Amino acid sequence: MSVSWIVDCLSIFALCILIIGVAIPRVQLLAYRKNLLDKPAKRKVHKAPTPRLGGTTFLPALMLSFTIVVAVNIVTRRGELLAELASESLPLASVFCALILSYILGVFDDIRGVGYHVKFIAQSISVLIIIFSGVELSGLRTLLLLASWPQWTVVPLTALAMVFIINAINLIDGIDGLASGLCIVSFVCYGIAFVFCSQNIYALLSFAFVGVLIPFFYYNVFGTQRKRKIFMGDTGSLTLGMMLCFLNIKLTQMPQDSLPHINKYLLAALPLMIPCFDVMRVFAYRLLHGNNPFLPDNNHIHHRLIRTGLSERTTMITLILSSALLTLTNVMLCNDLGVMLLLAADITLWIVVNVIICLLLKRKEKRTNNSLIEKQ
């Protein structure tokens, strides 16, 4: 990465921090004036009405900062960014169109509420816009041992994977700082990977979202319940999910030679493992118990960890650090152990952790029942 690219990445990172830092207090004020608040409920952990429009600042901040950086490059006649922008114009145009559609869907959902059928249709249209620009999981059939399947199956498989990632990010957003923290880990990982792949325009977008999320994380986690705290809402989680699934698939399209020390598919999947594994477990649980898999409950991993006795803050830190350590450990061991063995180890670890959580919850429930019996 040249000095020019480093300056651009630092500039867009700083601009996003500045824009979000200025915008969020104003969005909070608007939310209180219009009563656009997320009210406490049985399934939710917050105790006071809280603005849920933090995510409405994400896409405008990205587009404004991106435009400023491009404009500066045009004025100063620095050609590196402009050349890469021209070569990647179609996928970039497609992802911004998809982001705008997701943004509109999220705003409607945060203000009026949108059914999951409408969400699924809108998400499907958004991901198809990206796929038809050439962003697809071309090696997914081989990876899943489905090489004999016809070529046309690439499109539905890619669409399914993208919608799955979007909803995984949306559903993990259950406690303060968790979704934004996990996404920061993901964007940092993808940003570094794209630097090694010499795909600096995508590194730029990755680090831009890190800049978007840092001030939001501060307000979301450290803001007091009254007047300072804010949630990202569906607007934010859908925006983050859309960009993450786009960068995820772009990373799998990079030449494997540019990432000699780790399999590109594994690297793309690693930062998203916790939300994706959690969604698979929750959906399986709901189906096994005869419930609609698309209707919310309090059975996500963060809910379960809180029920074991951990605080909300400790749960958030534990899951974010686990994601970062899981990613780092897999990267370090990939050459020695191989992709399939590492993936099997990751799945086994996830199962063991969930079994331990189940045992802890059963023991706590047993203690509670015994104490109630003693009181009677």
Question: Which residues make up each language-model segment?
Answer:
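C-terminal membrane-associated helical module and adjoining short loops/tails
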Residues: 1, 253-376
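"…together with the soluble PPM/PP2C metallo-phosphatase catalytic core" -> "…together
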Residues: 2-277
